[in-house]
């Protein structure tokens, strides 16, 4: 077998008949499969052992040779080679066809490659191939020209003969008529008898004339056809063709079927054709030029690749190895077989019949029919259903052809090459493990034993518990007591990977150190649930075991859960306390007035109360019951750092551990602060979720990950402990209905009645009534909500849960205890009848019914959203999978400008709300200079929070930062342009697959995005705004938006004219150029609100001034227009901004750089307008880097560079346009991609990730890139002594090449444990 690590590219091309014969080990001559009595393959059949190899290892068909010692011998009796049976997976056969057939991919695909090559319309091509028309393959012009006059004279003679014959016949008939009439007259017949005779005579003469004329016309047609006869001409009339063949057979050749196509291709001069097409393109116009361009693409492909177009017509058909189209016996003695065998059988049957007919010398019409059937059967084998009705099997099911095996989710690419199954894995239900540390998981004993079986067996032998591997295996299977001790030892510090489907981002797989637990459920740390999106309502997770030392090291260093606290999308911590933990910490840090033992100032009667010399003393008081955790106290602290402002007052040289200070706080807050790192300033406030998030963010920014991990673990423990102690529970009694509710409802009911009366009187129309009612009831709902909030006591558990940020919100509380309010109908409009009841009181039947609309739509939406969002992620991954950090710095000077703050009216700086996702974690492209010219931060510095604060303090509002949009790396991007990795908080590593991270970061929140298209605030007739997921798809697919808004092509003054339904906008340019007119703009779309020159805002009106690229109407701008008018940089900014708007509306934080990575891929290509002296074809798409390199080369040689314009491609198109044919074929439209790749003889350089996964190489990202792969690990003596590996008794296991990823894999299938006796 070929080792995948030793080749660098993979090429696909057209196979000629000779290639097919070279691959083959013999010809399949019979349609038989296996003998149903002996169950052995039939000789020369589809499973023949002589062709494909033996069915049993080292055993020939007749049984003469058995055993491995005869290896390589070919049996003289049955002709079978003695070898392994697995050669039946790789040996191919072939079928020699009695007549050539065309390959359906090249004839039927769109566009038809054969048609373009031969310049034949697909319809004509079909007629030729399926024997409905003859085609002229060659004409001997010279001979025809030389003998034309002779032939013409012969034709004239023939015509003369026909005319003479006609005249003679007419003469004779006329004389006979005269004689008959004379005779009748003599007999004295009546006049009507005479008339009848005359009429019949004249009729016969007319027929004679017509017959002669037809003959003359036919001769004319034959002659005209012959004189104009040219190659590739179709002749549908069989009689005409026969005549031509009989008369002028030596001057031309013609045929039908694939043979004629083959002859045409043989006579085809590719170079001459390419030259003439280039000439047409240079001089032609319109349709003619377009057609020539399309044809040139195909012709040039053959010219440049050196492929022979003969490969599109087959003389032999390959037969794939039998193990890939198996036949298996079912229980009932029946057989199940792959559809391919049926399809091959049809081909062989028809082929054999055709051979027989040709040998018998059957009439041409019968032979042609058989040839047509053969062509159809080969078509069905290659791509069933592409032409005509598909061939069906039992139960009218279309048979799966070779193309179907590659296509779609169940095809070879997606099912078997990109989604392989893994050994050393298990799955089970998950339960919570609150006692675990962040980097641990609980692994059921039985599962661990099965997973670590080889390790345990090896260790049992090492420790002399077992004599050999076989007995060790028996011990493990019988679960002897020693096994458990060995298992404990083996799993120590051996991380396992846990994965929960769907794995939407990279945190869906993390490494943990296993702890053995009883039971059969995997225990999961509560803080990693957020990353896995797991809950414990029956979710299952899979466990995988990293085997090699390198895999274990990667799992521990890169994938351990405590190293993955930050989200790769936004850089915010994901391992946050949630639900009960939040409630517990909130309870712990609450301050309650009047609680037991609270601080009281000294009076003349009593000293100070509630003052403690240390936290320990306060805890003693609490244990004694004299102090509540939530009471305000004064306490002297020495081990906790004071808040920053207090520290500046109290300690001039800064606080050191041991310095005492007094805090006015609660014991709970002191306990909370003891959980944080020593040097973290004291936090003296109530901890709701937002504050907790802020603290953990801060910790992640300032402390190493290990400290953060330990801290969140402590917070988790404290959270659970105090949540239990707080006794927060919810019962019916806690759901309190506010007493004002009745009065509020009655008041609004009266208003609604008034509106209803107006409507009845006709003072309001239907729409106005509905809008007024909706407004009234929205106010009522809001008022009930406010009343509810004021009515609830502070210690109510429901309010505590909501206010702490653990879960839920006030709207849900209002629904429970206030009123549900207005609901929508399936169209998304409000139903003007509100739901007045709360869930506590219960709904009436009508209320329940109208509530179900929204509820059911919600469920349906969720299901649709999940599928859509998954598909979006898949397309994003596909388009960005080859964006990998390839170098440290591309040294570009370019960058993009980002805003840090806006100046307010009073001159103060207002920090930009989106700094976190725009400037944060990037690298400065130029020095940041303040108003006086001082350099605040130098170029190349990373922008973290401290740096941004420094810039704002210096009054700098915008900075220029490096971005992937301006990166000049030839492949992938450079680390400096990408900036900081959001997941680690450090500069991104070389080898990081930032493209995939970007796709996951955008795709993972996709499910949260809403499906619906929003109505603009109740304005009827207002255009729908497309929002949510559809909008994101529209942007990434670069589609023209519905209701697109025109943008100003030039800067100038607006002239506005309106008619009944339309606006007409004319822009008079400032530079005095031609006026630009936008006609027929629908009034329904409404004009854009703009800021006028005097600073006021208003609708665009006559005389306003607009800049280039300003939108003129409401709606979304078309990105292609933005590209045309404003250029690539603006369209990049536009797309990033628009995508971010959708995500921000849902409260999802994603860093701009992820969206930029995708947008960069959408703008990578250039359309060639003029090819200059380059090889590019006009109208073709090419990579920008390739375009620039080629232009540089041509200019250096003194040629004319090509002209091109940037083009914006949607992600699906961009994925299919990738250089890698493997990646494109595994994405969509597999057959089309492969057809194209084969004609162009495409070579896949294996740069991206997908290509390498498909052929089984390590991916060129992460530790798979060459700079990491060629590291050699030299273990120390201790490591050598302590390490245990998969059973292997060779001491050279730790030879110097230990750790080389390119070493041969262990063939586990061939391991017989019996060798170790």
From Swiss-Prot:
Mg(2+) binds at residues 535, 537, 539. Gene3D superfamilies: 1.10.132.30, 1.10.150.390, 1.10.1790.20, 1.10.40.90, 2.40.40.20, 2.40.50.100, RNA polymerase II, clamp domain (4.10.860.120), RNA polymerase Rpb1, domain 3 (1.10.274.100). Keywords: DNA-directed RNA polymerase, Magnesium, Metal-binding, Nucleotidyltransferase, Transcription, Transferase, Zinc. InterPro entries: DNA-dir_RpoC_beta_prime, DNA-dir_RpoC_beta_prime_bact, RNA_pol_asu, RNA_pol_N, RNA_pol_Rpb1_1, RNA_pol_Rpb1_3, RNA_pol_Rpb1_3_sf, RNA_pol_Rpb1_4. Binds 1 Mg(2+) ion per subunit. Zn(2+) 1 binds at residues 60, 62, 75, 78. The keyword Nucleotidyltransferase applies. GO terms for molecular function: DNA binding; DNA-directed RNA polymerase activity; magnesium ion binding; zinc ion binding. SUPFAM superfamilies: beta and beta-prime subunits of DNA dependent RNA-polymerase (SSF64484). Its cofactor is Mg(2+); Zn(2+). It is an enzyme of class 2 (transferase). HAMAP family: RNApol_bact_RpoC. The RNAP catalytic core consists of 2 alpha, 1 beta, 1 beta' and 1 omega subunit. When a sigma factor is associated with the core the holoenzyme is formed, which can initiate transcription. This is DNA-directed RNA polymerase subunit beta'. The gene is rpoC.
């Amino acid at each position: 077998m070929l080792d995948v690590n030793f080749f660098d590219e993979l090429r696909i091309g057209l196979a000629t008949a000779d290639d097919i014969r070279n691959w083959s080990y013999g010809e399949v001559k019979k349609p038989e499969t296996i003998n149903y009595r002996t169950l052995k393959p039939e000789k020369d059949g589809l499973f023949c052992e002589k062709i494909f190899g033996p069915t049993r290892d080292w055993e020939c068909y007749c049984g003469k040779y058995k055993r491995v010692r005869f290896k390589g011998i070919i049996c003289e009796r049955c002709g079978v080679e003695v070898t392994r049976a697995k050669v039946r997976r790789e040996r191919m056969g072939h079928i020699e066809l009695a007549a050539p057939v065309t390959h359906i991919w090249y004839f039927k695909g769109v566009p038809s490659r054969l048609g373009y090559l031969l310049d034949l319309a697909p319809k004509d091509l079909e007629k030729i191939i399926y024997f409905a028309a003859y085609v002229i393959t060659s004409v001997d012009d010279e001979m025809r020209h030389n003998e034309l006059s002779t032939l013409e004279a012969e034709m004239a003679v023939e015509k003369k003969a026909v005319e003479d014959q006609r005249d003679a016949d007419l003469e004779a008939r006329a004389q006979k008529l005269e004689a008959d009439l004379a005779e009748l007259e003599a007999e004295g017949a009546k006049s009507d008898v005479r008339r009848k005779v005359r009429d019949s005579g004249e009729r016969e003469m007319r027929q004679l004339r017509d017959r002669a004329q037809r003959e003359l016309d036919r001769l004319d047609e034959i002659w005209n056809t012959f004189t104009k006869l040219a190659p590739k001409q179709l002749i549908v009339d069989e009689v005409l063709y026969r005549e031509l063949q009989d008369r002028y057979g030596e001057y031309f050749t013609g045929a039908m079927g694939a043979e004629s196509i083959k002859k045409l291709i043989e006579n085809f001069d590719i170079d001459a054709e390419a030259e003439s097409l280039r000439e047409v393109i240079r001089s032609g116009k319109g349709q003619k030029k377009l057609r020539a361009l399309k044809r040139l693409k195909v012709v040039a492909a053959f010219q440049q690749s050196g492929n022979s177009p003969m490969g599109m017509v087959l003389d032999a058909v390959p037969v794939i190895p039998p193990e890939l189209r198996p036949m298996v016996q079912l229980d009932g003695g029946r057989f199940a077989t792959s559809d391919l065998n049926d399809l091959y059988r049809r081909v062989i049957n028809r082929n054999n019949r055709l051979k027989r007919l040709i040998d018998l010398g059957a009439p041409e019409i019968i032979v042609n029919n058989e040839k047509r059937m053969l062509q159809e059967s080969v078509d069905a084998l290659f791509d069933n259903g592409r032409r005509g009705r598909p061939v069906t099997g039992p139960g009218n099911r279309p048979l799966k052809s070779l193309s179907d095996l590659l296509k779609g989710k169940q095809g070879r690419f997606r099912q078997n090459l990109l989604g392989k199954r893994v050994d050393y894995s298990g799955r089970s239900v998950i339960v919570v493990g609150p006692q675990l540390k962040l980097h641990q998981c609980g692994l059921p004993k039985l599962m661990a034993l099965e997973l670590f079986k080889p390790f345990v067996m090896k260790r049992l032998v090492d420790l002399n518990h077992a004599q050999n591997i076989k007995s060790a295996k028996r011990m493990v299977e019988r679960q002897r007591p020693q096994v458990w001790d060995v298992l404990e030892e083996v799993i120590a510090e051996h991380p396992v990977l846990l994965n929960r489907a769907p794995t939407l981002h990279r945190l869906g797989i993390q490494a943990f150190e296993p702890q053995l637990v009883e039971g059969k459920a995997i225990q999961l740390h509560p803080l990693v649930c957020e990353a896995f999106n797991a809950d414990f309502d029956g979710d299952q997770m899979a466990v995988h075991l990293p085997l090699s030392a390198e895999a274990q090291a990667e799992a521990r260093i890169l994938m351990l859960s405590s190293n993955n606290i930050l989200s790769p999308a936004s850089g915010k911590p994901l391992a946050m306390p949630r639900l009960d933990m939040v409630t517990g910490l909130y309870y712990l840090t609450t301050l309650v007035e009047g609680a037991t033992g609270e601080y009281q100032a000294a009076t003349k009667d009593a000293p100070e109360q509630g003052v403690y010399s240390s936290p320990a003393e306060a805890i003693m008081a609490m244990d004694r019951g004299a102090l509540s955790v939530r009471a305000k106290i004064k306490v002297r602290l020495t081990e906790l750092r004071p808040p920053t402002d207090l520290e500046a007052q109290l300690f001039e040289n800064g606080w050191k551990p041991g310095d005492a200070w007094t805090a006015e706080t609660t014991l709970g807050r002191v306990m909370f602060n003891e959980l944080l790192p020593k040097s973290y300033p004291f936090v003296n406030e109530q901890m709701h979720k937002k504050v907790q998030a802020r603290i953990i963010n801060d910790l992640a920014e300032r402390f190493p990950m290990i400290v953060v991990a330990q801290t969140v673990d402590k917070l988790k423990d404290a959270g659970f402990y105090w949540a239990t102690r707080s006794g927060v529970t919810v019962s019916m009694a806690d759901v309190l209905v506010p007493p004002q509710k009745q009065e509020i409802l009655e008041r609004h009911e009266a208003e609604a009645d008034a509106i209803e009366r107006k409507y009845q009187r006709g003072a309001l129309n239907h729409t106005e009534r509905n809008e007024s009612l909706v407004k009234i009831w929205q106010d009522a709902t809001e008022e009930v909500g406010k009343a509810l909030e004021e009515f609830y006591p502070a210690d109510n558990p429901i309010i505590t849960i909501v206010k702490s940020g653990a879960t839920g919100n006030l709207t849900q509380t209002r629904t429970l205890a206030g009123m549900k309010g207005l609901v929508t109908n399936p169209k998304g409009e409000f139903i003007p009848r509100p739901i007045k009841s709360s869930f506590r009181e219960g709904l009436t039947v009508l209320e329940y019914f109208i509530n179900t609309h929204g509820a059911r739509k919600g469920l349906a939406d969720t299901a649709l959203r999940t599928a859509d969002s998954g598909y979006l992620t898949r397309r994003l991954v596909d388009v960005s999978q080859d964006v990998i950090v390839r170098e440290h710095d591309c040294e570009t000077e370019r960058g993009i400008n980002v805003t840090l703050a806006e100046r307010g009216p009073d001159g103060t700086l207002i920090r930009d709300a989106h700094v976190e996702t725009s400037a944060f974690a990037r690298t400065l492209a130029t020095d940041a200079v303040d108003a006086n010219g001082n350099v605040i931060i130098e170029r190349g510095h990373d922008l973290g929070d401290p740096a941004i604060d420094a810039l704002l303090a210096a009054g700098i509002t915008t900075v220029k930062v490096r971005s992937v949009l301006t990166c000049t790396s030839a492949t992938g991007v450079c680390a400096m342009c990408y900036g900081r990795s959001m997941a680690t908080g450090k500069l991104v590593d070389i080898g990081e697959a930032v493209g995939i991270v970007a796709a996951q970061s955008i795709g993972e929140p996709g499910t949260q995005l809403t499906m619906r298209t929003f109505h603009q605030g109740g304005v009827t007739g207002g255009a729908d705004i497309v929002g949510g997921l559809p909008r994101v798809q529209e942007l990434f697919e670069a589609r023209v938006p519905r209701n697109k808004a025109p943008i100003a092509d030039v800067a100038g003054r607006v002239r506005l004219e309106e008619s009944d339904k339309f606006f007409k906008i004319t822009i008079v340019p400032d530079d005095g150029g031609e006026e630009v007119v936008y006609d027929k703009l629908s009034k329904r779309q409404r004009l854009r609100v703009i800021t006028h020159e005097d600073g006021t805002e208003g609708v665009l009106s006559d005389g306003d001034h607009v800049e280039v690229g300003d939108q003129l109407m409401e709606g979304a701008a078309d990105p292609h227009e933005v590209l045309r008018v404003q250029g690539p940089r603006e369209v990049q900014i536009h797309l990033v901004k628009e995508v971010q708007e959708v995500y921000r509306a849902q409260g999802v934080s994603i860093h701009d750089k992820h969206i930029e990575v995708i947008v960069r891929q959408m703008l990578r290509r250039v359309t060639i307008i003029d090819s200059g002296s380059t090889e590019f074809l006009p109208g073709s798409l090419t990579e920008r880097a390739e375009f620039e390199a080629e232009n540089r080369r041509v200019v250096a040689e003194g040629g004319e560079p090509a002209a091109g314009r940037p083009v914006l491609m949607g992600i699906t198109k961009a994925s299919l346009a990738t250089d890698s044919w493997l990646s494109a074929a595994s994405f969509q439209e597999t057959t089309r991609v492969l057809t194209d790749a084969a004609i162009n003889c495409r070579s896949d350089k294996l740069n991206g990730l997908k290509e390498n996964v498909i052929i089984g190489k390590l991916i060129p990202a992460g530790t798979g890139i060459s700079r990491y792969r060629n590291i050699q690990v030299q273990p120390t003596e201790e490591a050598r002594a302590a390490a245990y590996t998969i059973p292997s008794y060779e001491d050279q296991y730790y030879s110097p090449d230990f750790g080389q990823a390119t070493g041969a894999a262990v063939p586990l299938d061939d391991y017989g444990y019996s060798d170790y006796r």
